[in-house]
Each structure stands twice: as C-alpha cells, then as structure tokens.
Design a protein with these regions (language model features):
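Sec-dependent N-terminal signal peptides
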Residues: 3-13
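Transition segments tied to proteolytic processing and entry into folded domains
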Residues: 11, 15-132
Length: 132
C-alpha cells in the first residue's frame, strides 16, 4: 500500500499540466509581436529522434497587418519565424505543439524575439498561431 501511494504521488508530481485559457491570454498579451502574417516560404528539416521525430521549421512571411509590434513592424515587412515541432508517439500532457504552417497560409501570430535576433520565436507554445 505504501509503495503504491508513493508511486502515485511520484507520478502525479511529474505530470505536465496543460496551460489554462487565462494563461494563454496573458502570454498572448505579453508577446512582443502580434502580427497577421502570410507564409511566403516554409522550410522544414526532419530529424528522427527516440519515439518520433523533431521538425525544425523556418518560415519567411510577409506582414499583412499589425496588432502590436515592439520592433515597429508594419504591413509589407518580411519576418522570419523559427520553431520546432516534436512529433512523438506518446506526447506528455502539456500546452501542445504548434502546427506546421503551409505556404500561402495567413494566420495571426503571437511571437517574441529569439536570442540570436535573426528570427522570431513562438510566444504561446501551441497557441501561437490563430485564425486571423
């Protein structure tokens, strides 16, 4: 009984919780860039990993409209967005992965600046892309 209880407590302590709608809204509001973008080019690199694959995505997109922009982006600007998607057989519970964008697709994107300053990164995990 004690062993079962200890195992249960250990299992519960390692669960990744999904993020709440309030937390998603807060992250969207705090994103440095809230832009409507059109994917002009989508480059994908797939790497096999244990239990699945890692998909590195580089998107070159044109800014269609600006909700807000700390960098001063304006319609017509070209931005680069870099992100990864883990496509694994048994994903842990959590915020979920972003979806792969398609060339020509227009979406509202919540983004932050990457540390290399060469591209933007997702600000809200799997909730960074929304219908415009």
């Amino acid at each position: 009984m004690r062993t079962s209880l200890a195992y249960l407590l250990l299992s519960l302590s390692t669960l990744h919780a999904a993020i709440s709608p309030d937390h998603i809204r807060r992250l969207q509001e705090e994103a440095a860039e809230a832009l409507v973008i059109k994917a002009e080019q989508v480059d994908v690199k797939i790497t096999e990993v244990k239990d699945g694959r890692r998909i590195d995505v580089q998107v070159t997109a044109s800014v269609q409209s600006v909700i807000r922009s700390k960098a001063g982006h304006k319609p017509g600007d070209v931005v680069k967005v870099a992100y990864k998607v883990m496509d694994i057989k048994n994903p842990p519970p959590g915020p979920g992965e972003a979806r792969l964008l398609s060339k020509g697709e227009t979406i509202r994107a919540y983004l932050d600046h990457s540390s290399d300053k060469q591209s933007l990164r997702l600000a809200v995990y799997g909730h960074s892309f929304q219908k415009p």
